[in-house]
């Protein structure tokens, strides 16, 4: 898990966020990969789901750990690096096998500023405390056991109510 966090922090530093709090950088990276093409509302919603998971005892209690949660395996390269098992993580970008490089640094900087606001200010939760979201063209089996709260852009938001 430490290697996964180190990889994410390296991506953040390469994007110009090296001086920032790691949690804010992780949140920005998640919003960037999950919602960079969406409106501010769509980006806020993705950020709020991430933070709602941090507040929920069923997930780890840090943003970076929520994002990297899931099974990992040793890299086939023999380097000792632990990599996420494909398609078995909380956020698809993290374990889809594609590069996590930030290709739009200006977009990332704007999202990073948004992540700072989300981390440091109380806001009305536009997802109604949602802890899950799929794209509207996906029908995951888990959605049957969650309560739908809203739809923003192309994401449908759900809350996992039973603790």
What is each model feature region?
Residues 8-10, 18-21:
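Cleavable N-terminal signal peptides
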Residues 1-11:
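Sec-dependent signal peptide recognition
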Residues 21-163:
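Bacterial extracytoplasmic/cell-wall-associated proteins, especially those involved in peptidoglycan
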């Amino acid at each position: 898990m430490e290697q996964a966090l180190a990889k994410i922090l390296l991506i953040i530093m390469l994007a110009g966020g090296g001086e920032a709090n790691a949690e804010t950088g992780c949140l920005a990276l998640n919003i960037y990969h999950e919602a960079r093409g969406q409106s501010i509302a769509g980006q806020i919603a993705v950020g709020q789901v991430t933070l709602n998971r941090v507040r929920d005892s069923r997930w780890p209690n840090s943003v970076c750990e929520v994002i990297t949660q899931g099974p990992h395996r040793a890299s086939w390269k023999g380097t000792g690096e632990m990599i996420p098992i494909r398609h078995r993580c909380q956020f698809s970008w993290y374990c889809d096998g594609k590069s996590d490089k930030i290709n739009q640094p200006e977009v990332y900087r704007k999202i990073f500023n948004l992540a700072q606001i989300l981390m440091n200010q109380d806001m009305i939760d536009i997802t109604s405390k949602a802890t899950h979201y799929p794209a509207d063209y996906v029908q995951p089996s888990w959605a049957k056991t969650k309560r739908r709260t809203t739809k923003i852009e192309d994401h449908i938001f759900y809350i996992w109510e039973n603790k």
